[in-house]
């Protein structure tokens, strides 16, 4: 007859196992395991077999093992797991892609009936339609104030009814009605609550971000930094081009309003004095091969326009 291990021996074995996993893995999913049965957990372990290990245990034991590992190795990074070990949770150690592992875990959710006293994880809404129940069952609907009518010898629900709100406890009447309707409103499985990756802890929603999402958020951040920098006149890499452009505009405005000048301002002053030069300058680059001809045509057209103007004609009229 095998000798049963004592509690102290079990703790030593558990500490050894968890410390070994912490040595081998740098990625961990912290998962909630409420209402998850042993058979369901076994199926999840089989599904993740290969590059992932599921470890369950009491929070106190897990915290104890993490502290022991930190003391032995001097690696304090895993201590960030301690605040996450609250409630009925487990750890999934993995070397695979975190998003793929998270999606694999989600596949093993199973439907569950609404049991009396259970706290509803979601809103439960009963949709309108024929229930298939005979008229003698109407008392269940009347107790819950669900509008019904008799249609072809069966009870039919007329309008959608919010039977249970998220966070409320399931009552006996609600549980009985859902059972009669064959509705299993809840689904349970391991739910990823937090992600640990090489010392960083973050929300599992981050796993769903795509490269486009990251680029969009980065661009929005740069835009905000640029706007703030310009508003308070604080130089940053993002705002520098705009600051140089604004400074140039300000200096140019001063040069135009005063006798002060500089090479770039001289060009602008020349354009303002004789706009026809600006027209010629714009027309010139249109054709690289016949640039001279374009300039000549532009000048001739200007002269013709002035001549036609005296005769009451408009070249563009």
Swiss-Prot record:
Alphabetical list of Pfam families matching this protein: Ribosomal_60s, Ribosomal_L10, RL10P_insert
UniProt entry tagged with the keyword Ribosomal protein: yes
GO biological process: ribosome biogenesis
Signal peptide start-end: none
The keyword Ribosomal protein belongs to this UniProt entry's keyword annotation: yes
Keywords: Phosphoprotein, Ribonucleoprotein, Ribosomal protein
Gene3D superfamilies membership: 3.30.70.1730, 3.90.105.20
Protein origin, superkingdom: Eukaryota
GO molecular function per UniProt: mRNA binding; structural constituent of ribosome
Entry comment on modification after translation: Phosphorylated.
GO CC, alphabetical: cytosolic ribosome; Golgi apparatus; ribonucleoprotein complex
Quaternary structure and interacting proteins, as annotated: P0 forms a pentameric complex by interaction with dimers of P1 and P2.
The protein's role, per its UniProt record: Ribosomal protein P0 is the functional equivalent of E.coli protein L10.
PANTHER family registered for this protein in UniProt: 60S ACIDIC RIBOSOMAL PROTEIN P0, LARGE RIBOSOMAL SUBUNIT PROTEIN UL10
Similarity-based family: Belongs to the universal ribosomal protein uL10 family.
Record protein name field: Large ribosomal subunit protein uL10z
Native organism: Arabidopsis thaliana
């Amino acid at each position: 007859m095998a000798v049963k291990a004592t509690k102290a021996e079990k703790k030593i074995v558990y500490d050894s196992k968890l410390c070994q996993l912490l040595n081998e893995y740098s990625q961990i999913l912290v998962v909630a395991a409420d209402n998850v049965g042993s058979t369901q957990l076994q199926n999840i372990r089989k599904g993740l077999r290969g590059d992932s290990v599921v470890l369950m245990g009491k929070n106190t034991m897990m915290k104890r093992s993490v502290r022991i590992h930190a003391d032995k190795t001097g690696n304090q990074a895993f201590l960030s797991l301690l605040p996450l070990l609250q409630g009925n949770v487990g750890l999934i150690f993995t070397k695979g892609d975190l998003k793929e592992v998270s999606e694999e875990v989600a596949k093993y959710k199973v439907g569950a009936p609404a049991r009396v006293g259970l706290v509803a994880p979601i809103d439960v809404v009963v949709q309108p339609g024929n229930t298939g129940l005979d008229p003698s069952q109407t008392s269940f609907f009347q107790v819950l104030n669900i509008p019904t009518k008799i249609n072809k010898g069966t009870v039919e629900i007329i309008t959608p009814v919010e039977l249970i709100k998220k966070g409320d406890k399931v009552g006996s009447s609600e549980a009985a009605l859902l059972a009669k309707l064959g509705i299993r409103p809840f689904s349970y499985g391991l739910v990823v609550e937090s992600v640990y990756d090489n010392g960083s802890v973050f929300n599992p929603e981050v796993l769903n971000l795509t490269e486009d999402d990251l680029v969009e958020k980065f661009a929005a951040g740069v835009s905000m930094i640029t706007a703030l920098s310009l508003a308070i006149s604080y130089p940053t890499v993002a705002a520098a081009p705009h600051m140089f452009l604004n400074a140039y505009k300000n200096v140019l405005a001063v040069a135009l309003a005063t006798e002060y000048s500089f090479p770039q301002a001289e060009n602008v002053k020349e354009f303002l004095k004789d706009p026809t030069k600006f027209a010629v300058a714009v027309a010139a680059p249109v054709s690289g091969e016949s640039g001279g001809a374009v300039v000549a045509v532009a000048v001739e057209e200007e002269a013709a326009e002035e001549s036609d103007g005296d005769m009451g004609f408009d070249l563009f009229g």
